[in-house]
From Swiss-Prot:
Catalytic activity reported: (S)-2,3,4,5-tetrahydrodipicolinate + succinyl-CoA + H2O = (S)-2-succinylamino-6-oxoheptanedioate + CoA
InterPro entries, per database record: DapD_Trfase_Hexpep_rpt_fam, Hexapep, Hexapep_transf_CS, THP_succinylTrfase_dom1, THP_succinylTrfase_N_sf, Trimer_LpxA-like_sf
Protein name from the UniProt record: 2,3,4,5-tetrahydropyridine-2,6-dicarboxylate N-succinyltransferase
Gene name in the database record: dapD
Organism, as annotated: Histophilus somni (strain 2336) (Haemophilus somnus)
Keywords: Acyltransferase, Amino-acid biosynthesis, Cytoplasm, Diaminopimelate biosynthesis, Lysine biosynthesis, Repeat, Transferase
GO biological process: diaminopimelate biosynthetic process; lysine biosynthetic process via diaminopimelate
């Protein structure tokens, strides 16, 4: 355990007692370093290990929660309005050179909190990215999409208009929602509660997936919870109840595609040829 992690872990045991006036300088410095590391992409709340499994760094989530205890609300100037919050906006001190160096686009109306990382090639339409989130290279966050606290978004992902990717700071033991590389999430879909959408998936418009949602593979009859297998094309559907008197909502895997096919075939064609 690093010294930085140790300071944060120990402080979190007494989080309810910490206030902006009684916090030690060492703790402030540790939390600031952790938030800055998240902001720059040096640290990530979740990352893959050598076995390809997602590992959650709970101490970084604790650092985010501690930052709320350390800071009072202040007035934050914005282009069109003012804000009153404990967390500054990410771009508050950016100039032209900083934006060029970072290498992403942020159109008017995009709100990003400090402590989230935006990679090169990202396009942020009017959207919201919360603290602790990570957005990978080449990803599009479309209009009114929301990337929740600590969510992990892979490379070359398209989050369509109105998509909601759930955040998770409390309960602390819950895992962040993860969207793998090269995924397409259709308009107004919601992926929440630490669900993992693996690489190369296509989620159709208006699909809602949480930990209790049945994810039904129509080819095999298998049912998944909390994980969409790589290369899945998913639409909304329903399954009959045990008594057979009614149907309940589910997500349906209608087909699988490999990376080569996904690269050659348009998204709309994949979604339209599901029969």
């Amino acid at each position: 355990m690093s010294n930085l992690q140790n300071i944060i872990e120990c402080a979190f045991e007494r989080v309810a007692e910490i206030t902006p006036t009684n916090a030690e300088a060492e703790l402030r410095a540790a939390v600031d370093e952790a938030i800055e590391g998240l902001d720059k992409g040096i640290y990530r709340v979740a990352e893959k290990n050598e076995q390809g499994e997602w590992i959650v760094n709970q101490w970084l989530k604790k650092a985010v929660l501690l930052s709320f205890r350390l800071n009072d609300n202040v007035v934050v100037d914005g282009a069109e309005t003012k804000y009153y919050d404990k967390v500054p906006v990410k771009f508050a001190d950016y100039d032209v050179e900083r934006f060029k160096t970072e290498g992403f686009r942020a159109v008017p109306g995009a709100v990003v909190r400090k402590g989230s990382h935006i990679s090169k090639g990202v396009v942020l339409m009017p959207s919201f990215v919360n603290i602790g989130a990570y957005v990978g290279e080449g990803t599009m966050v479309d209009t009114w999409a929301t990337v929740g606290s600590c969510a992990q978004i892979g490379k070359n992902v398209h989050l369509s208009g109105g998509v909601g990717i759930g955040g998770v700071l409390e309960p602390l033991q819950a895992n962040p929602t993860i969207i793998g590389d090269n995924c397409f999430i259709g308009a107004r879909s919601e992926i929440v509660e630490g669900v993992i959408v693996e690489e190369g998936c296509v989620i159709s418009m208006g699909v809602f997936i949480g930990q209790s949602t049945k994810i039904y593979d129509r080819e095999t009859g298998e049912i998944f919870y909390g994980r969409v297998p790589a290369g899945s094309v998913v639409v909304s559907g329903s399954l009959p109840s045990k008594c057979g008197k009614y149907n309940l909502y589910c997500a349906v895997i209608v087909k699988k595609v490999d990376a080569k096919t996904l690269g050659k075939v348009g998204i709309n064609e994949l979604l339209r040829t599901i029969e």
